[in-house]
Amino acid sequence: MLQCEQGHAPNATINTQMRSPMRVVVLSDTHAPRFWKTCPPAVAAQLSEADLILHAGDVCVPAVLDELAGFAPVRVVLGNNDGPDVAAWGAPETAEFDIDGLAVAMIHDSGPRIGRLPRLRRRFPQADLVVFGHSHIPWDESAGGLRILNPGSPTDKRRQPHGTIAVFDITDGRLERTELVDVS
């Protein structure tokens, strides 16, 4: 079971019989409409296999979330460029939830790179996985039972060679595969 805030029903519970493994696609920093005009084909190809979509903020317009929700249920947190319209879609500043036994937390800005993992461990002590965004720089680090993951940005790569998203599979509360995917 997945409890999920989606659309204009922020307290909605989505009960689904997910396949095993469960496929999760993670995006951040889409910055529509400046960089995201519509879902890029390489992103859509990954989303077509998703059971759940996580967006770590800087959506900028709720139409992106509506488009993503056409593929799978969406969890989203507010980014520093998101306004009341994205909040009204159901985006809190942080989120903590369970996916098939995996404790997940999401936040947009994780602070400076130095000390990030211990800082997120203190902020989300129950989490197995913390998803974050803001920097547009992919990041995947693990220590002491915590994994932190920034998917980068699919559309505003900044100083990175490619636009990226993250894809992972979950079975029985375990991350089985995590991949940063080039979507340029």
Language-model-derived ranges and their functions:
Residues 68-71, 121-125, 143:
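Short, conserved loop/helix-junction motifs that constitute active-site signature segments
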Residues 2-8, 12-74, 82-93, 101, ...:
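N-terminal active-site segment of His-dependent metallophosphoesterases
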Residues 31-34, 82-126, 153-160:
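Active-site-proximal segments of metal-dependent phosphoesterases and phosphodiesterases across multiple
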Residues 94-95, 138, 166:
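Residue-level detector of beta-strand structural context in well-folded domains
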Residues 136-148:
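A short, charged
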